[in-house]
Each structure stands twice: as C-alpha cells, then as structure tokens.
Amino acid sequence: MKNELEKVMAGRDMTENEMNMLANSIIQGELSDVQIASFLVALKMKGESASELTGLARALQKAAISIPTNLTNAMDNCGTGGDRSFSFNISTTAAFVLAAGGVNMAKHGNRSITSKSGSADVLEALGINLYLPAEKLAQVFDKVGLVFLFAQNLHPAMKYFTPVRRQLEIPTIMNLTGPLINPIPLDTQLLGTSRPDLLELTANVLKGLGRKRALVITGEGGMDEATPFGLNHYALLENGEVTLHKFRAADVGMSEVALNDIRGGEAPENAEILKNVLENCSSAFLETTVLNAGLGFYANGKVDSIKSGIELAREVIAQGAALEKLHELQAEQIG
C-alpha cells in the first residue's frame, strides 16, 4: 500500500487496476484500520478520479453476494449520503412511487452513517426484513418488482470499511462507491450525490459500468436529492453521451418549499412521513417525493421530460398504487 499512498499524496491518480488491487487487499483483511483511514483521507484530499471509482466499484461488486433474479431492466435510485441535510428518506419514499409506476426497483441502501435515519433504518421500522437470503430476495423482486437490498448484508467486504467510516465522520470515496455496486445488474439509475463537482465524472463511471441511461443529481446546498428549492444540477447519460443541465422547481411546474419543511427525524418518524406521502397527504414531503420520483421516471426513460415524470408520480400516488406497493413489500419481504 505504501507506493499507492505516496502516489495519491503526491496528487497523482491511481489506475483502475491499481485501485482494484488495493481494494482486494482491503477486502482480504490485509490492511489495518489506520491504513484504510489514511488511504480514504488521502483520496479525499486529492480528489477521486474516474479510474479510482471504477476500480473500487468493480472489486466491491465482484465480492458482493449475487441475487439470482429473473427480472431485467432494473433500476436503483440510492444516493451517496453525507449531505447532512437531515431530510426525510426521500429516495426510499420515491422508490415505492417508481415501482408502482412500472419500474423494476432494486433499492440498494444501508443504515445511517451521517444522518439520523438511513434507508435500512426506515424500512426496518416499516417491518421490512433486512436479512433475507439472496434467493428469497430474488423471489421478492420477481414478484413485487421492488426489493430492498441491505448493503451490509450483501457486501461482506464492507465490514473492513464501515468502522473506519463511522470514526472519520466525513464523506469519502466509499459514499461515492456505494450507489455503484448494486448486487443486481442495473440498466438505468438515478444517483444523488452531495458532490456537484463530480456529476459528470460519476455519469461517465456509470457509463463505464454498463448503464444504458442514468441521471446524476445534486440539489441546492449539496443535497444528494433533487430539491424543490434553489438550483438543481444534473448530468444525464443518454445514448452513450453525458450532458450537463440545471433546473429550478418553477422550471418543472412546481412551487418551492423550504429545507426546514422537509427535515426528518429518527426512523419511526421518517416511517410515518413515508406512509403519509404514499397516502397522498399534502405536504412539502409529498412535493419533494413527487419531484424525485419524477426525476426517476425520466432517468429510467419512461417519460421524455422531468415535468412528465412529475405528472406520472402524482398520478401513481393519487391512485393509491404507491401505497399498495408498500403493502406488497411488507407482505413479501418478511420472515
């Protein structure tokens, strides 16, 4: 590791192969927590490259437990986290809307690292079993068109990174890598990042990892979700090309809400918020979910504009289909 660390500290990027080999050394338990921490901090100070992200993602995905699903055209909408906005679980709530709208959602996530409630925490509060074996998860996905994939349970290699990440308490390359390593092969993806400087880079990494279409979003203030306030920036991967865009709520037919109005709490509180949204209760939480689900429909290619995606999201919720999708998952991802 010494040579790689010196290279990074000198401001030079590691190749994909170098990163892949170093990641495999970590996965095999050959490096100490201190060595892993120094490596993560050095990468953060230098700035992560596409080759480093790709090499790490390939190593971690290869080490993941495979999900033997029969479904194709899978999508995920998880974000990097680390924005410290303390919002409710936006992408998790939106996942039910997307699944109800006909998108095969392989929702990948974890417990909270820097927030009060991660996707795993809120879904566990809703009665979802985080620890089903891979074969059962595949059955749930095939039947419901939605499954929650608990990263901690499906990425045994993460046990070497998690304690270090908790102690560092800062976003690292691991936040950027998490959304890239879904155990189910993805065709499309909506990926939220708290790093607007990495929008184009992340979209190109997704292209290299085989995504057919993807959208990488950073909201106002570095939120890793689309925000119905301020300016949103995104990179769109479409037809093999990456383009950069921006929009405000008014540009997609929405009124602005305040950040304070979408703050969440601990898992039980966020679970109630999620249910209220799917029950179509008018609120800033609903508007934020509609925006992000609409963006997801657009990222998936199901609609030809963000505005059309928002309209579809409103329709799906109003018809009760999103709430029914929650009930379906609660009935199947149990035991």
Curated annotation (Swiss-Prot):
Pathway assigned in UniProt: Amino-acid biosynthesis; L-tryptophan biosynthesis; L-tryptophan from chorismate: step 2/5
GO biological process: L-tryptophan biosynthetic process
List of residues binding anthranilate 1: G79, N110
Binding positions for 5-phospho-alpha-D-ribose 1-diphosphate per the UniProt entry: 79, 82-83, 87, 89-92, 107-115, 119
Binding site residues for Mg(2+) 1: S91, E225
Record note on cofactor: Binds 2 magnesium ions per monomer.
One cellular component (GO) term of this entry: cytosol
Record keywords: Amino-acid biosynthesis, Aromatic amino acid biosynthesis, Glycosyltransferase, Magnesium, Metal-binding, Transferase, Tryptophan biosynthesis
Residues engaged in binding Mg(2+) 2: D224, E225
Binding residue positions for anthranilate 2: R165
GO MF assignments: anthranilate phosphoribosyltransferase activity; magnesium ion binding
Cofactors (names): Mg(2+)
Enzyme class: transferase
EC number, UniProt record: 2.4.2.18
Catalysed reactions listed for this entry: N-(5-phospho-beta-D-ribosyl)anthranilate + diphosphate = 5-phospho-alpha-D-ribose 1-diphosphate + anthranilate
Superkingdom assignment: Bacteria
Xref: InterPro entries: Anthranilate_Pribosyl_Tfrase, Glycosyl_Trfase_fam3, Glycosyl_Trfase_fam3_N_dom, Glycosyl_Trfase_fam3_N_dom_sf, Nuc_phospho_transferase
Similarity field: Belongs to the anthranilate phosphoribosyltransferase family.
Function, in words: Catalyzes the transfer of the phosphoribosyl group of 5-phosphorylribose-1-pyrophosphate (PRPP) to anthranilate to yield N-(5'-phosphoribosyl)-anthranilate (PRA).
Database matches in NCBIfam families: trpD (TIGR01245)
Subunit text: Homodimer.
Protein name stated in the entry: Anthranilate phosphoribosyltransferase
Species assigned in the record: Lactococcus lactis subsp. cremoris (strain MG1363)
Gene behind this protein: trpD
